[in-house]
């Protein structure tokens, strides 16, 4: 894990992007984002900047939480994300299309 908060944020978004791609999704499919920050005042600007590069829409909903610590002492930021995949066809297609 990198020491700088900027590098940790970049790494978190790269890993999130990789998970999304693996599932056939992208950042545009996110519906909820929760970020946890140690020393939130020191890192919020960098987080917003990096987030804006990855997520270019107004969505997803974003909750920002300041925390005393994370799972390991050197972790400064953590991201929880929820994405939604659109289902095309199948038995629910009529309900979705109406």
Protein language model regions, located:
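Short, polar/acidic, helix-capping and beta-turn segments at strand->helix junctions
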Residues: 1-98
